[in-house]
């Protein structure tokens, strides 16, 4: 795993979010104020803008910086929760593991950090269930 793979994955997330923009916006308008899509798009764009600065850096450092960028650019509770997920992932990177194993371990840690911060768990109709 390296910074290039992380930014490639983030770009794929951006593409998927852009493809489902209308659906995401509609869902947010039904339960919120409808601005989630704009906030998350801004956060991802600004995170992708870090690519040159973070090129060649260790994956845990890249994830931590992306998490901090999400925290400062995505409003509301979703910014805090997504940044917690990503920064939680950064704490478990181990360069001795395969990419697949690292992703599994890191994502599990990120989800646990998000559950703790949001004081929620699966099945409670939160972001974790989506």
Task: Place the predicted regions along the sequence by residue.
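N-terminal loops that bind phosphate or other acidic moieties
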Residues: 1-130
């Amino acid at each position: 795993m390296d910074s290039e793979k992380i930014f490639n994955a983030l770009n794929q997330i951006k593409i998927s979010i852009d493809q489902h923009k209308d659906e995401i916006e509609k869902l947010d308008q039904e339960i919120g104020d409808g601005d989630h899509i704009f906030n998350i798009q801004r956060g991802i764009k600004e995170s992708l803008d870090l690519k040159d600065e973070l090129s060649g850096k260790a994956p845990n450092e890249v994830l931590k910086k992306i998490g901090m960028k999400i925290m400062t650019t995505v409003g509301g509770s979703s910014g805090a929760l997504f940044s917690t997920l990503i920064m939680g992932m950064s704490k478990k990177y181990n360069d001795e593991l395969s990419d697949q194993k690292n992703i599994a371990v890191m994502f599990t840690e990120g989800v646990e950090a998000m559950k703790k911060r949001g004081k929620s768990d699966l099945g409670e109709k939160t972001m974790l269930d989506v």
